[in-house]
Every structure is written in structure tokens, then in C-alpha cells.
């Protein structure tokens, strides 16, 4: 599945069925969605920030890992575009949370405890989910899971900073491989050329009005 850039309909359906039936993945979704759709607007913003800044990243680790080794390059380009979009979402929802908290300073301690508790819960679920997701993907499974979790802790700190809190996992985040961090750069491994037809940069088109003479073939 990871060695091909396109999957058959049967493989896609099997992956969907696996996701629906995976307990860790479903608990992971429930942990966030119960607050995302809850009645507390500030907790909703915390959930939205963690959804955009933390929960997406474990599944992107292996394609980035492969791209650092010259495989799945175009897939990594697409992932960088997705992550760029999600970075804006995470920053904005975190910004809105901080502005909302300024209007309710009496809730600062409550929401700080809520946020850190939710992040800890999600990190435990990420470890279980990543074990299910990547189990058997590579011969050195433990090294792979360790790399995933370092990457997840790195993004957990980014999520906390979006919410206005100090990073809590610097020791774990520091174990993220430098090549993975480099692969996140927007201009990393650009492949804008005739043959690939892809890349992780936005190319702005230029319009030119046609003249009558243009249609004289």
C-alpha cells in the first residue's frame, strides 16, 4: 500500500473498513469531536486547533520518510500543500482561542488544565493508533514508531504554541529526524517540471486577452 502512489478500489475500500473498525482511531476521533461539537466555544477552539495541528500528522510521517529516501516524491509534494493549509487552520483557531480567553480570564486555569489533559490523552491514543497503522510497514518497526512519536510530540508542541501555551515535549520533539523537519519545508524537493506536473508551490497563472488575429490558424 505504501509503495504505490495509487491504490485499487478494493484497497481503498479495505482501508476505509479498517479505519471504521479500528478502536484506537475511533476513540481518537471521539476524544476530539465531543468537544468540537460541544456547547463550550473555547473548548471547541481547542479541539479545532488540535485537530488541525496534531491529529493529522502521524499518518503523514511515512510518506515524508520515504520522500527523504527518493520515493513517493510527488506524494510528499501533495502532503506539504495539505500541511500548509492545515497550518493556517491551526494558527487561526488558536488565535481565536487566545482572543476568547482574554475575554474570560477567570477560566484560564480551567482551560489550561483541560488543554494539557486532552493533549496527553491524544498522545496516548496516537501511540496506540500509530502502532496499528504502521505495524509491519518496515522491518525495523520499533525505530519507525519511535520516529512517528517524536514527530507527533513535535507537532503537539506546535499545537500548544498556537493556543498560547509553552511547549511541553521539547525533549521528545528533539528526537524528530532532521530530514523529516526539512521535508516539511514548503520548497523542499520541488518537482515543477514537464514530466512530474506537480510540486508543493502555488503557481499563479497569468491571463492574457486574446485578439482576433489569434484565431487565424
Where are the regions a protein language model picked out?
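Non-heme di-metal
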Residues: 3-217
Amino acid at each position: 500500500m505504501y509503495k504505490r502512489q495509487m491504490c485499487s478500489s478494493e484497497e481503498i475500500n479495505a482501508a476505509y473498513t479498517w479505519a471504521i473498525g479500528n478502536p484506537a482511531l475511533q476513540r481518537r476521533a471521539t476524544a476530539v469531536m465531543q468537544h468540537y461539537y460541544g456547547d463550550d466555544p473555547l473548548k471547541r477552539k481547542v479541539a479545532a486547533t488540535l485537530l488541525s495541528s496534531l491529529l493529522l500528522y502521524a499518518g503523514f510521517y511515512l510518506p515524508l520518510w520515504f520522500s527523504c529516501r527518493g520515493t513517493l516524491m510527488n506524494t510528499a509534494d501533495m502532503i506539504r500543500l495539505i500541511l500548509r493549509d492545515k497550518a493556517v487552520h491551526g494558527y487561526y483557531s488558536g488565535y481565536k482561542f487566545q482572543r476568547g480567553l482574554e475575554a474570560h480570564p477567570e477560566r484560564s486555569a480551567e482551560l489550561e488544565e483541560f488543554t494539557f489533559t486532552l493533549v496527553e490523552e491524544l498522545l496516548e491514543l496516537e501511540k496506540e493508533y500509530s502502532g496499528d497503522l504502521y505495524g509491519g510497514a518496515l522491518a525495523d518497526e520499533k525505530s519507525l514508531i519511535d520516529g512517528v512519536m517524536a514527530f507527533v510530540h513535535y507537532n503537539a508542541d506546535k499545537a500548544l504554541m498556537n493556543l498560547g501555551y509553552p511547549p511541553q515535549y521539547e525533549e521528545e520533539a528533539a528526537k524528530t529526524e532532521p530530514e523529516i523537519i526539512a521535508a516539511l519545508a514548503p520548497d523542499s524537493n520541488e518537482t515543477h517540471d514537464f514530466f512530474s506536473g506537480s510540486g508543493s508551490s502555488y503557481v499563479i497563472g497569468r491571463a492574457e486577452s486574446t485578439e482576433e488575429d489569434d484565431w487565424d490558424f
